[in-house]
């Protein structure tokens, strides 16, 4: 596909989406309502305002074929495992997809086209050996998915077109915070999809996103979610952790600093090379979490939301806990 053709397709798709936004919400199908909830969220453009066209992009021709805005019910949930590449960008190394019936239609490793510096195995479950055995490129994956998207199917993930992190929300007092996929699964579906200390699986995460969308479509569950007070208060959030402090070193430091010592850590990797990362420390109860926060040595202050936090020092750096 050449540049001009891609731009024509993109413009046709843009016009189709613009027409959809002008349509009355009263005419929406349940599936379209979720798309609208995603598109109308104030944070949507923050995540989805991309460049007009990039070399490796696949641009569909849906807008060229459809004279009227579609009323689709075909949905596809997708999830990817990402690694950190040598140039500081992220690369896709595994893709999983399920259909509306939760049937697995894709679960493949992807051969990255850039050198990898961090496989994030503890998070992704992907090893260097897995990637070395991969034979499919990202273009191959696009071609495998293309038949499932050709009829204007809706893409679901945390986060993609139906972005479950934008569909579901916390109460107004916490409107800038987005619920994690695990939080949504515990609150809406009643189970953990990502257990602390256990690596992710893209097929399981894709299936969880599909189940969340179906819960709204079929069961009409409330999209305003809250953690139980006990579950919310049993966690401490660590942020602005420097990249040179490895997750293993972090765990060793916390084992020395935190009391009680019976806790698990869920690390969220940095998006860019050299960037800060964050982590959630999960205790058995709110009492234990409060004890750990009060017992740890650090400079006490408040964050931008007015929540108490501490700047604590470790063997080679500092970070915040709240």
From Swiss-Prot:
GO molecular function list: exonuclease activity; nucleic acid binding
UniProt xrefs under Gene3D superfamilies: Ribonuclease H-like superfamily/Ribonuclease H
Keywords: Exonuclease, Hydrolase, Nuclease, Nucleus
UniProt-annotated location(s): Nucleus
GO CC annotation: nucleus
Phenotype of gene-disrupted mutants: Plants do not show a phenotype alteration due to the redundancy with other SDN ribonucleases.
Highest rank taxon of the organism: Eukaryota
All copies of domain Exonuclease, residue ranges: 75-213
E.C. code: 3.1.-.-
Keyword Mitochondrion: no
InterPro entries associated with the record: Exonuclease_RNaseT/DNA_pol3, REXO1/3/4-like, RNaseH-like_sf, RNaseH_sf
Free-text function comment from the UniProt entry: Putative 3'-5' exonuclease degrading single-stranded small RNAs.
PANTHER family associated with the record: RNA EXONUCLEASE REXO1 / RECO3 FAMILY MEMBER-RELATED, SMALL RNA DEGRADING NUCLEASE 1-RELATED
Family according to the record: Belongs to the REXO1/REXO3 family.
Identification of the protein by name: Putative small RNA degrading nuclease 4
Gene behind this protein: SDN4
